[in-house]
């Protein structure tokens, strides 16, 4: 995950699990 805020990290994790981006 890209460094940022805790909320941003959680959001990206969710998106990563669901859609599998490239984070």
UniProtKB/Swiss-Prot annotation:
The keyword Secreted applies. Residues 1-23 are annotated as: Disordered. Transmembrane segments: none annotated. GO terms for cellular component: extracellular region. It is found in: Secreted, Extracellular space. Keywords: Copper, Oxygen transport, Secreted, Transport. Its main location: secreted. GO terms for molecular function: oxygen carrier activity. One of its GO terms (biological process) is oxygen transport. Hemolymph. It comes from the Eukaryota. Signal peptide: none annotated. Hemocyanins are copper-containing oxygen carriers occurring freely dissolved in the hemolymph of many mollusks and arthropods. Belongs to the tyrosinase family. Hemocyanin subfamily. This is Hemocyanin subunit 1.
